[in-house]
Design a protein with these regions (language model features):
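Bacterial N-terminal signal peptides that target proteins for export
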Residues: 2-11
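Bacterial N-terminal signal peptides
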Residues: 11-19
Length: 200
């Protein structure tokens, strides 16, 4: 005879096996949970219609005019040396005029607040030191009341592009054009942008 506790254990194991076998015969309902689609927070920024060269914008007592654009395949520096672009590139020169129309002195916008656009591609300025042309990066950083300055910005762009492919941008409150942004999560993406066509 088996002791009682061994009999109980044997019955328990048998019951467990019987339950497991009968459970495999039952069909299991599959539950599919579909997560709701996440809201698309990203919007495509619509850029303003570009102005023609020589038109002026006013932003917080600054008058900014893009006077003209010019493409060159080389230039003479103010040190009387000749500079040529890297392979497959050319120099784009943007002539701008700024005036402090406010009642107090103001900081000159940093060069990073200017860009040239070709579609979604953005180019930033670099030093030029072109002979007989005032370099924007060499200007003093403070403009007194009523002061006006005119200077040139240099951009290195692909040689295949023409003036009609390009737009000049003034970004007074940001350093790059943000084409895709979430206005609620990224309010900086909605900073003002002023555009000019580079072609006359």
């Amino acid at each position: 005879m088996f002791p009682i506790h061994k009999t109980q254990n044997l019955l328990f194991v048998g019951l467990f096996i019987l339950t497991a076998c009968s459970a495999t015969d039952q069909s299991v309902a599959t539950v599919t949970i579909t997560a709701p689609p996440l809201p698309d927070l990203t919007e495509l920024k619509i850029l303003p219609t570009p102005m023609s060269p020589r038109q002026t914008v006013v932003h917080r007592n600054f008058q900014v005019t893009m006077s003209q654009a010019e493409l060159t395949n080389g230039y003479q520096t103010e040190f009387d040396s000749t500079r040529e672009p890297a392979a497959d590139t050319q120099f784009l020169w943007i002539h701008i005029v700024l005036k402090n129309s406010g009642q107090q002195e103001q900081d000159l916008p940093e060069p990073e607040h200017f860009s040239v656009l070709n579609g979604r591609t953005e180019y930033k300025p670099t030093y030029g030191h072109r002979k007989d042309h005032v370099d924007y990066m060499a200007l003093t950083t403070i403009m007194v009341k009523g002061q006006e300055v005119d200077a040139w910005l240099r951009f290195d762009i692909p040689a295949a592009l023409g003036l009609s492919d390009l737009q000049f941008a003034f970004l007074p409150e940001s350093s790059q054009v943000s084409l895709a942004f979430s206005p609620s999560a990224y309010p900086w993406g909605d900073h003002p942008i002023y555009l000019w066509t580079c072609a006359p």
